[in-house]
Amino acid sequence: MAVWHSANGKVYLPPSTPVARVQSTDEYIQRTNIYYHAFSDRLLTVGHPYFNVYDITGNKLEVPKVSGNQHRVFRLKLPDPNRFALADMSVYNPDKERLVWSCRGLEIGRGQPLGVGSTGHPLFNKLKDTENSNSYIKSSKDDRQDTSFDPKQIQMFIVGCTPCIGEHWDKAIPCEKERQDNRLCPPIELKTTYIEDGDMADIGFGNLNFKNLQESRSDVSLDIVNETCKYPDFLKMQNDVYGDACFFYARREQCYARHFFVRGGKTGDDIPDARIDNGTFKNQFFIPGADGQDQKTIGNAMYYPTVSGSLVSSDAQLFNRPFWLQRAQGHNNGILWANQMFITVVDNTRNTNFSISIYNNNGALKDINDYTAEQFREYQRHVEEYEISLILQLCKVPLKAEVLAQINAMNSSLLEDWQLGFVPTPDNPIQDTYRYIDSLATRCPDKTPPKEKEDPYKGLKFWDVDLTERLSLDLDQYSLGRKFLFQAGLQQTTVSGTKSVSYRGFTRGTKRKRKQ
């Protein structure tokens, strides 16, 4: 018999004060028909693929680490459009509006041929292959081997006006009442940090701080054994209320398990057996071997694969092709606040490592009679080549109270850059100014000079690219500009000395009837 009961749960009331709504930039940004093309130089970097090379004292960095598995984070600096000497001053009213940039398209160019890179460790913790074992595994004091493999294949780029947010797992601080012994596994936690230029990407071993959590220094390859592998925190960036960190992104990852190994060393977490709770777990996970058998002493269960990125093909490339931004995933639809843009790139499909051999002894190569390996020094180098092109649209921000209130809550420094800060009334309109302030006859100058504007990303490492003098209105003179004009049926016109883009319609011819 069904009986109705009143709800016993809590009654939730709406908040007494309304929650501030964040507007999309499309609701208050006014776009113009003026477009600029920006492009960088050919960006090159050369280094060692696995580690930094220092001199014998350790004070001088001789060769930096440059790996195809690293993140490249480009910080593009754009000119301030409010300081432009526009030929047509009717474009905007400086008393009521401010100009900003909007990204409408970009192309990330990549040089160098496709290639598969190899990484590894000369003392890799690989006890034995567990996929096709023909005898029971016995461990010794040191079972490390010289092992190499190819990393997971990854192509990815993330575009925004703030740095990309990454995530990784790191050692956590345990509770005081549960303070553990240093010999036991520490607790771990997920940490969120900015991805900087040079941070390693995941190559198949996860996004982990290997420096803190793998003290054997033999569980992963050389290029990440002393590093932290980061992965973009797409969940956090997609739910960002302003959407500045990620306008859009493109990603392609692939891998498969090529080899299956087992770790050597003492097992930290034993398989539950008869020793627990007076035999409750006896024969629950395994049945012990007989006396005299190798299986009497159970082996290690620390299984892991080494992955492979498999085929590298030009048919699945994200680079050297244009991308157009019509609608961003967040509230910021491509507006480049503070006149800067961040592009985070990972591409290990061009991961070839050069091998360079140099004759070690005095004399010429023609004087060598017999080959001896000790006569030659072997070096490794990796190179990266980039080129970035942008299509920028000039936009206007109305200086209205509700718009300025949201911008102030988002980033108050923007209003200071626009010279809209509050200016207090001076107490005394007459100030003292000395002529020879540095001479011995006058007092010392102020000990606290005016403080310069501090970089909000001070201390973070980026690849700075200055585009302040790399803008052009002649879109048809550049490859990406022509693609932008043609793909939407646009044409470029000049009005009052200012070049703008207008729509050019296409008319289809009348289809002729086929004769019967």
From Swiss-Prot:
HAMAP family per record: PPV_L1
Gene Ontology MF: a single term = structural molecule activity
Q: Name one Pfam family in it.
A: Late_protein_L1
Membrane-crossing residue ranges in chain numbering: none
Query: Where this protein primarily resides, as one coarse class?
Result: virion
GO BP terms in the entry: endocytosis involved in viral entry into host cell; virion attachment to host cell
Q: List the record's Gene Ontology CC terms alphabetically.
A: host cell nucleus; T=7 icosahedral viral capsid
What does the similarity note say?
Belongs to the papillomaviridae L1 protein family.
- Subcellular location, record wording: Virion; Host nucleus
Q: Which UniProt keywords apply?
A: Capsid protein, Disulfide bond, Host nucleus, Host-virus interaction, Late protein, T=7 icosahedral capsid protein, Viral attachment to host cell, Viral penetration into host cytoplasm, Virion, Virus endocytosis by host, Virus entry into host cell
Role of this protein: Forms an icosahedral capsid with a T=7 symmetry and a 50 nm diameter. The capsid is composed of 72 pentamers linked to each other by disulfide bonds and associated with L2 proteins. Binds to heparan sulfate proteoglycans on cell surface of basal layer keratinocytes to provide initial virion attachment. This binding mediates a conformational change in the virus capsid that facilitates efficient infection. The virion enters the host cell via endocytosis. During virus trafficking, L1 protein dissociates from the viral DNA and the genomic DNA is released to the host nucleus.
Q: What is this protein called?
A: Major capsid protein L1
Record text on subunit structure and interactions: Self-assembles into homopentamers. The capsid has an icosahedral symmetry and consists of 72 capsomers, with each capsomer being a pentamer of L1. Interacts with the minor capsid protein L2; this interaction is necessary for viral genome encapsidation. Interacts with protein E2; this interaction enhances E2-dependent replication and transcription activation.
